[in-house]
Amino acid sequence: MRNTYLKEVYNLAAKDRNVLSLVADNGMIVYDDFRRDFPEQYFNFGISEGHMITAAAGMASCGKIPFAYTIGAFLAYRSFEFIRLDVCLQKMNVKIVGIGAGMSYGYLGPTHHTTE
């Protein structure tokens, strides 16, 4: 799923400079091509999922098309209020993508489980 997602966002960004890729501390090498080819369309917020969502909403309010992407557990649990207030209630065009459903990242411990 991750590689397919990254390929599609890459293709969209190549066609439209308004497409942005936002990540929260996913410093994986799978982003190397995107970072190299679209440095002004890539933003890494570090371990700050809520701020990533708020920034995505701000970018969307300016006509950008942000894709916010990170581990599902952190996206759902740490960002819920920001998603609710900044994206949903404001009706912002933000694409929110979480990876690692269930126990996919089980080896990293219970903080990374998306099971509730």
What are the residue ranges of the model-derived segments?
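Thiamine diphosphate
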Residues: M1-E116
